[in-house]
Amino acid sequence: MRGRSYDPKETPLVGGMKTRTIIENGQRVGFECVDLITGDSAVMAHRDIDSRHRILGYGLDPTALDNVGVEAIRRTTEECEILIIDEIGKFSVESEAFVEAVRSALDKDMPTILTLHKKSRHPLLQDIRRRDDARILEVTPVNRALLPYKIHKLVRETY
């Protein structure tokens, strides 16, 4: 794990976690989860991870997601005003702790921005899609540059 300096006395407005692609020699070889506040990161899926849990040729390390991603979600729901989770996808839903952390976060009354794997039929993603208090925006090559502005406007108008 690696990270950047984090001052717990300063309460950040936004927190959460993101998934970052690992590229080696021009090839995608894995994914890491990154805490948006601390910068801590851990490899959660990699072609070189020897694991009985494999998805799309990647070995999974669920403890990486539990230690960084789940902790980032929990800290954000306690300390911040806005939660971001990028992304809830095939790798992350393999962690029961992650699924529970997301469900718990969604029970809180706070603006939450999630990216969802479009094709996944995992119960967590299905439940999120069915929520009355959720607004689903599809990212396309045409709208991807404008979506941050649209999301900012929606959060401002709603909260």
Where are the language model's segments positioned?
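Glycine-rich loops and low-complexity Gly/Arg-rich segments
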Residues: G39-M44, L56-L60, K108-P111, L137-T140
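N-terminal phosphate/diphosphate-binding loop that engages ATP/GTP or pyrophosphate donors
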Residues: R2-L56
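Residue-level preference for the first positions of well-ordered beta-strands
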Residues: G15, E81-I82, P111-I113
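Short linear motifs at secondary-structure transitions and domain/linker junctions
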Residues: M1-T11, G57-L60, E87-F91, P111-T115
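Phosphate-binding/switch loop-helix module in NTP-utilizing enzymes
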Residues: D50-R103
